[in-house]
Every structure is written in structure tokens, then in C-alpha cells.
Amino acid sequence: MEQLTLRERESIVRARLGLTSNHAAAYAARDVDVDVIAAYPITPQTPTVEKIAEFVANGEIRAEYIPVESEHSAMSALIGASAAGARTFTATSSQGLFYMYELLYIASGLRLPIVMAIASRAASAPICIHGDYQDVMSMRDTGWIMIIASSAQEVYDSIIMAYRIAEDQRVLLPIAVAFDGFLMSHTTEPVELYHEEYVRKFTPKNLDRLILDSSRPITMGAMAVPDWYYEIKYQVIHAMNNSIEVIGDIHREFNNSFGRSYGFVESYMLEDAEEVVVTYGGIWGDVKRGVRMARKDGIKAGALRIRLLRPFPARDIVMSLSNAKTVIVLDRAVSPGATVDGPLALEIATALKLEGIDARVISAIHGLGQRTVYARDVYEVLKSSHHDGIQESRVYLGVREYGSG
């Protein structure tokens, strides 16, 4: 694949700013020229919609901003707007996501290309405004394509790509782009913003889909009896499964257009790795550092980051982990009562088993409620695994057990 020259890259980049992931999401929504934004502020997502409201007020974007009274209303408004042909955007977190939950299925069932940013946050109770991925993991079965970013630049780029993916005729599904609450949503990082004309050339508005139009009346969202419900739902499943090819195509086109390469997964030192840490989100930098620390101790360690959660890129994951002896899955969410407690660990274990790969899978829960996890913690779990110090298939890193004071 031909790479952009330095001069070509410089001509594409409009500005280099220090941005939080919240603001990176807002700039992406501005640059793709969204038509309708409906949102209700909730920590730690609030700065995203505040910044978009500022863009609208300043005339930087010609869009309708709807300050609704709840997240349920926000998604309802976007469903109506998207059904009428508008390009739409919202953002939320935690209880806000749960409040719009019934609408998530409606958005995917109606095949509406809505894009939503999620600043991930712990689920109440107890009330906790800090970050983990319990909210994000709760929507895996709603029919939304799901991307988890690990940097503010990736948030910006992923939202731009999300519109191309969602609006593709082969897909027509809503997309959620998630990132760590506070650890990313409120942390300033360098971000390159692209000139609007390049972004809008990459994301042309595609109205080649059925919309509510009084000049061409259609019925949308009608009741489906058993004779047809199954087939309609199967179309959503079919679109989701086939979207992985579209996502790959758009990744390659984005690289050709902007000089940034993304995949379904990201690997680190996997060539000869026997002990592999699998994770997602903003902890990726600490995981890589922990792997380097383990390598200095002679442990053949590596790491894999899952960027695309839905559709689940099982083939890429299996290829990446085919030589691993132990796979430690770091989950910042929990599925109580499941076969293994980590939502991602359950998916990884299933993918490996179906392909006959006999690696040991350890579900390692970490950082619930944003409990801090350091690179040394990753190193310690790798060292313990290497020396057969982990006997259980599930571990909780850094938790004070009941009765321990």
C-alpha cells in the first residue's frame, strides 16, 4: 500500500491541537458535517456535547442541536431524524446509555446509521462517575457496530470512519465509538485535525436508502408478526456479519486518504510470544510497557488490543494468538455468573476453542470503578502466569477481598 509523502500529509492536516477524547469526538462530528445532534449531558461525556453546542452557536457547523430532557429522548429524536435522512450524532455514558437501552434495538432494527460516542463509566449502584467498561459491554447484543479506541487521535479518526461504515449500503447499522471515561475523556493528547474538505470528500452524504419522505411515502417501524419478524432480524445479523469486510475496506481507504493505519486488532511483540495479554481501551500503553518489563526478565510476553468489538474479529484474533500458551484477558467489566467473569475473556475463549487452539485462558478483571492499574501490575500478572502462580481461570487484580479490612 502506497504511503502518503510528508508533503501530502502536511497538506491534509489543518491543525495540531491538544484535545481530550471528548473534544476529539466533538471535532469529528463537526468535520463530517452532521445535521442533527440530540444529547443529554452526563459525566464524563458532558464536554463532548458542550463543545458541539459551542460549534453550533458559533456557526462552525450548520446543524440542529436538540437539548432534550433525557437520553431516552435523545435517541428517540435521532431515530426520527435519521429515518428522515439526516446525518446524526449523540454521546452518552453509563446510566444515560442504560436509559436509552430500548431505543438501541430500534435504531439497529430500523437500519439507521446513527453514530454515538461513549465515554465509558461504571454502572450504579453504588453511584460511581469514574470509568470502566460495564456500560459499553452491556450493549454487545443490540445490533450496533462497536469500536473501542485507545487514544484521542483514534477517537477522532474512528468517528470519521464510522459514518462511512454506517452509511454504506451493505451495512446501514448504527455505530458506537467508546473510550475510557476520565482516563481518556478528560486527558489532553496531541491530535491532528484534517481539513474539512478532505474529511467531507471521504464521508459524502449518502441518501441512497429508504427514508421518510412525504413525496414517496413508506411505512417504517410497523409491527412484524411471526411470519416476518425472524427474517427482518436475520437481515440485521447478516448486515453485521458482512460489515467486517466493509470495515476493512474503509480502514484501507482511510490509510490511503489520511496516512493513518487501523485494523480490527493491534498486536505488540507477538512474533514469539507464549504469554499474551489481551485488552482494550486506554490501558494499552501500560500493557505494552508491562510486556517490555516482562521481556527484560526473559519472559516471552506479547499483547493484543481488541479495537473492533462488534462484529467480533474472531479470525484475526485466532491468527494473532495461534502460538500462545497462556492468554490473559484484561477486562475492565464483569459478567457476574458467566462461565468466566470477563465479557471479552468469554469471547476469546470461545473463539480459540472453536478453532481447536488449546491455549489456557485466564480472565483477569481489573480497574472497576477506575481503580488504578499500573504497568507493573501487568508485569506481575505475566510473571505469575509464567511461573505457574495463577491456578484459577479467573482473577481479580488489586481487589481487597471481603473481610480483609
Predicted regions and their residues:
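Thiamine diphosphate
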Residues: 1-138, 143-144, 160, 180, ...
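Short acidic, glycine/serine/threonine-rich loops at helix termini
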Residues: 48-51, 77-79, 100-104, 125-131, ...
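Short helix-loop-beta junction
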Residues: 53-58, 249, 289-303, 353-354
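Conserved thiamine diphosphate
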Residues: 130-174, 178-181, 358-371
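Redox- and metal-dependent alpha/beta enzyme cores, enriched for Fe-S-associated oxidoreductases
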Residues: 264-299, 312-319
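Core nucleotide-handling region used for phosphoryl-transfer chemistry
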Residues: 299-326, 333
